[in-house]
Amino acid sequence: SIKPQRTLNLMNSAEKLAWEDELWNEFSASKYEESLTDNTVVYPVVGIVGQIRAGLGGFTKLKGDTAAQDAYIASLRENDTNWYNLLFRNAFSQGHHLSLSGGSDKSTYYVALGVNDEDGMLIHNSYRRYNVNSKMTLKPVDWVRIDIGMEAARQESRMPYSSVDPFNYAYFSNPYEKAYNDDGSYAADNTWFTLGYYNGRGVEQVMPKNGFSLLRELDSNYSSTKNTNGTFRTQVDLKILEPLHFVGLASYSFANNSTDKVVDKDTYTAFRDRLGSDDRSQTNLYGSISQNRTDRNSYVVRGHFAFNKTFGELHTVNVLAGAEVRGSDANTIFTKRYNYDPKTGTTSLPSVSGPQDEWVRQVEKLNGEYFSKTRYASFYASADYYLGKTIVLNASFRTDGSSNFGSNRQFNPTWSAGAAWHLGEEEWIMKALPKLSHATLRAAYGFTGDVNTSTSHLLVMQYLQQQYRYFGDETFNLGTIPSAPNPDLGWEKTQDAKVGLDLGLWKDRLTVNTEYYYRLSTDVVTSSPVQSTTGFTYVYFNAADIMNNGVEVTVNGKLLQKKDWTVSAAVNFAYNFNKVLKYKPVSQSGITSKDRYVEGYPTGAIFSGKYSGIASDTGLYQFRLRPDAQIATATDLNKPDNYRYFLGTTIAPYTGGFNLSASWKQLKISVSGMFSLGSKTYEKMRYPASYSNTSHSGVSTETVQSQFSDLYGNHLNVEKDRTNRWTPSHTTGVKYPRVYDYYDARYNFSSYNPMDYSIIDAVYLKNNSYVRIKSIILTYSLPSEAVKKLRMRGLSFNISMNNFFTFTGYDGMDPEIPGATYPTTRSVSGGINVEF
């Protein structure tokens, strides 16, 4: 896999330093001069230029010396660090697989072994996997068949660990920050954590003496995981009488997962993860090891009787009836130990710091246990009827029970029915349509059920460690109940109806499969906030009905068929329309951007403002008022309901894929891709730096309309074109709004402009339709004569390119994962396939 590139046009060192200097001169310079004689004056410190000009931190010697400051800033232009190159690499993976099979009429076997080894894109990331898969079929007598299978795998992975996301850091870190000092030691980042420190929160944000270096974090901290899992199953097929069978299956699965996270004492991650009052100390340093052990066990036992008989030459009946029980148990134990020595494995608790009761509470939270248990029971039956080769009728019924619901709603009976007419088996149709090679008309209707495993009907209490209530001589452990219990919580139910037509022409050189579907999901489980007077914050309940309908078409064609040449193509197209038919939350106060479901609109509906440009007088974003907006006073211009429109959906209504294959003799090339059309998304990255990282108590504030207007958002790296902004001398033809200081309250913008984020977020709304070439695969197979000389059955070589080409109008990093700072990876892989 190929490491990501910096494709979003970020500023280089010279551009970023010039931008910071421009902001200092506009927003800080005059206030800084005032602060020299009046310590009540607050001025913003943005970027390293702000720290240098103000003489803060390691730049106190430069205070007041403009020439020295300019010289130092000029030297920083020579540092142009590409953090993507330092933190990521081209990933390399290899896989080796061996399979063996054989047997006789009485028994057959199959064994497959596999080894995968991968060094990931992030430095120090590695992954290993070993797996074995074996099957055996025994036929001791004609009326008994026994299938025995076993699958086992072990995965081992190791990845660097940091409290700072390396993907975000690579994107937002300032390019003038050095990775290493001249002596080879880790260079401290002078800006990543300094915004709050130099803007009112210095007491709160104590930094380690050696500063913060992400490379130190990734080189010193790691998380290692080992996972072992296996499945054993046995299936027995007994012929009781000639038309009657019994099939029984028993399966057991287990998974053991262990994770160790080791944090070195000299890292920033360890500095921020200490007990009591140690988080304010620069000397009492210690690392830790966090260990997590999880065991999961599950089983499935299933049995059914099957009856299959043909009456005469035209009528065949298949009937099946059976039952299934399954369950799973999981247990997780976690512990965290400080002062960990990786050489000896020893640990010790740090000395008590701060209030002892608070310190004890933190220690008690270092260890704990989770456990869960689920049980399901199902009863099912089905019947199929065949009229010759032309008509097929089928019906099925099942009822499932789940421990996830209250006793009165544990079981959910469902059924389905379908029919198929094989038109291609009708002689009169084939005579009338000689080009037709096959055709089937099919229809189905039925009901299914689904369990929302993230919810529970039970009253669940989360105990608070080291917090008690005393009553008389008794002591009670305190706890919280996050959601209200709901004994009426039940299954989500889905009603399905489908009609399809499959046909082939010219001996199946062209095949077309079409299907229209209608799907109605009722009793969809949602969470809804409830009045605080109930004692709860939210409750889960069956509240929504959602309709989906659409059509799916798949076309396959053999475009060219000659002795040495073949060319074939396939395309799949799907259209889906969905709508929320009913949604009745416990409490409703109008449509907001937080609503997951809104009646009359599709799921994933986007409600926001209609962006209409940047106001030339204020420099703020403008949005179109609704036709029904009621503006009686200037403050009505601030109300979000006066601007809210339905703007589309985050779920693409048009999706599909395609494949084109061509071969010449032993050489074959295959190109496959996918497309997604009609969806929208918010291209809104969460900036690590903003006014919310700062604090000046007692200072009046001005509401910031968007992160593009936030002066403090420019503390870390931004796009090159951010300089194309509104200013008093540049009021039209600009891309970005005015930049202003949150602590400079003189405009009163929020009184007569929309400020609600659900309206403002419209400026981040993008159409993320795209067409992507997912893979290009070139394969060469040795001629059979050459293979025979090597005493092989087959030998082929292949090379593939994945995710190399994308066609889109979306200007973010990746339309498939919008808003990302790390795109879908491109990769090149090769393989050899040997058959004996």
Model-derived features: where do they sit?
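Short Gly/Pro-enriched turn/cap motifs at secondary-structure boundaries
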Residues: L87-A91, F371-S372, D488-G490, G648-T649
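Membrane-proximal, glycine/serine-rich, low-complexity loop/turn segments characteristic
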Residues: S1-G230, Q235-D237, A306, T316-V317, ...
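Conserved small-residue
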Residues: S1-A74, I333-D341, F541, K558-T650, ...
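C-terminal beta-signal and adjacent terminal beta-strands/loops
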Residues: P4-L8, L86-L87, P434, S661-I759, ...
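Extracellular/periplasmic, surface-exposed regions of secreted and cell-surface proteins
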Residues: K63, R129-Y130, K135-V144, G149-R154, ...
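Short Pro/Gly-enriched beta-strand edge/turn motifs at strand-loop
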Residues: L76-W83, K365, K639-N642
